[in-house]
Curated annotation (Swiss-Prot):
Cofactor(s) needed: Zn(2+)
Family: Belongs to the cytidine and deoxycytidylate deaminase family.
Assembly description: Homodimer.
EC number(s) given by UniProt: 3.5.4.5
UniProt keyword annotation of Zinc present: yes
A single BP term in Gene Ontology: cytidine deamination
CMP/dCMP-type deaminase domain sequence ranges: 48-168, 187-295
Function: This enzyme scavenges exogenous and endogenous cytidine and 2'-deoxycytidine for UMP synthesis.
Free-text cofactor note: Binds 1 zinc ion.
Name of the protein described by the UniProt record: Cytidine deaminase
Active site positions: 104
PANTHER family: CYTIDINE DEAMINASE
InterPro entries linked: APOBEC/CMP_deaminase_Zn-bd, CMP_dCMP_dom, Cyd/dCyd_deaminase_Zn-bd, Cyt/Deoxycyt_deaminase, Cyt_deam_dimer, Cytidine_deaminase-like, Cytidine_deaminase_bacteria
Length: 295
């Protein structure tokens, strides 16, 4: 990954490459740009907003983990706070393809796990597939979300997904990224369980009521959280493990460095993530211990 990031930086225009390199290679870079940092990039580059976001896509794509397709896709989400979040696609050799995370899903979940309450726009290398269009239609900002592609005028999500089916069609009025706290608690004193519980409490699961969260502990001691992101169309739902893995990937972590995992989910939900979580962790490393709690 580091080599691909270096290569991407070498492609950047000279007008802002030094400043961008300083940001991206900083030890505390978290694959986001603050509104102020992005404004400085705009000033240095002299580019239009849309052109600069497209120009930065190779940086996002450099984070991709695509051992199956070797097709590296990047995405950049702008949260309603003005901060920009990078994302990339993620695949798992040995796992069924349904465990794949698309770049759009990665960038959106990245923003969500860092506290964003909505997405203003998303910039991607290629036209979003139907799966991702439906995933984005779950968002709090689905009606106003803009999609930017290279060499094209921005369009709204609803232009890409006319006569769309979404949460409202199932009687749900709160979208993905709505601020929630399900208020679940546990006396379990295992740290990773408590961290997974934190993720569970912000999860979006209005259709199955399987509020759930995952926590991953790395060898470095860092812990990454993932909350379940359910979708009105069911299949585009993003499991909590994949959300947690996306957070780790966007911090430059290697999946080989996962030391332990925990899953907490609702005991009364209509589905369970346990079997799929175990299966996906198994293909990453069969020795990863998984703690489990059903509340």
């Amino acid at each position: 990954m580091r080599n691909r990031i270096e290569q991407a930086l070498q492609q950047m225009p000279a007008s802002f490459a030094p400043y961008l390199r300083e940001l991206v290679l900083a030890k505390d870079f978290d694959a986001t740009f603050s509104a102020e940092q992005y404004q400085q990039l705009l000033t240095l580059s002299g580019m239009e907003d849309s052109d600069l976001r497209v120009a930065l896509l190779p940086i996002a794509a450099a984070y991709s983990y695509a051992p199956i397709s070797e097709f590296y896709v990047g995405a950049i989400v702008r949260g309603i706070s003005g901060r920009l979040y990078l994302g990339a696609n993620m695949e798992f050799t040995g796992a069924q393809l349904g465990q794949t995370v698309h770049a759009e899903q990665c960038a959106i979940s990245h923003a969500w796990m860092k506290g964003e309450k909505g997405v203003a726009d998303i910039t991607i290398n290629f036209s979003p597939c139907g799966h991702c269009r439906q995933f984005m239609n779950e968002l709090t900002t689905a009606s106003s979300l803009k999609i930017q592609l290279p060499k094209r005028a921005a369009k709204t999500l609803q232009e890409y997904l006319p006569e769309s089916f979404g949460p409202a069609d199932l009687g749900i009025d709160s979208g993905l990224m709505s601020p929630v706290n399900h208020g679940k608690t546990s006396d379990d004193d295992e740290e990773l369980i408590q961290q997974a519980l934190r993720a569970m409490n912000i999860s979006h699961s209005p259709y199955t009521q399987n509020f759930s969260g995952v926590a991953l502990k790395m060898r470095s001691g860092a812990i990454y959280l993932g909350a379940y992101a359910e979708n009105a169309a069911f299949n585009p739902s993003l499991p909590p493990l994949q959300v947690a893995l996306a957070q780790a990937m966007m911090m430059g972590e290697s999946f080989e460095d996962i030391e332990a995992a925990a899953l907490v989910e609702s005991a009364t939900g209509k589905i369970s993530h346990l079997a799929d979580t175990q299966a996906t962790l198994e293909v990453i490393n069969p020795d990863i211990p998984l703690s489990y709690l059903s509340l």
